[in-house]
A protein has these predicted regions:
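Long, contiguous binding/interaction regions
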Residues: 1-101
Length: 101
């Protein structure tokens, strides 16, 4: 799997919601704040199902109602198209899980 170039990563991030490039870890990341712990856990479960379907898995750090997603392709050593695709799917699931208002 081919790594994305800097420009490709920057362009991909423009299409995503709240993601940033973590250059130090050669990954993209997003932190989401949910209303409470259980809604965060439900979100993590829905993302886990999507990750299994895609056979591509984000690193997830859960701190009460805050979840940080780190996305990279470990076997490739950085960010690939697969990472951008899963990040877009995570965005969809977050939008579905976060109450409007």
């Amino acid at each position: 799997m081919a790594l994305l170039e800097e420009q490709q990563i920057a362009e991909g991030l423009e299409r995503l919601e709240g993601w940033e490039w973590d250059r130090e870890n050669n990954a993209i990341r997003r932190t989401v704040e949910m209303p409470d712990f259980m809604s965060g856990i439900h979100l993590v479960a829905s993302i886990a199902r999507a990750a299994e379907e895609a056979d591509h898995h984000p690193d997830m750090d859960i701190r009460y109602n805050r979840i940080t997603f780190h996305q990279s392709t470990h076997s490739a050593g950085g960010v690939t198209v697969q990472d951008m695709e899963l990040a877009a799917r995570i965005d969809e699931l977050v939008a579905d899980a976060v109450p409007a208002g």
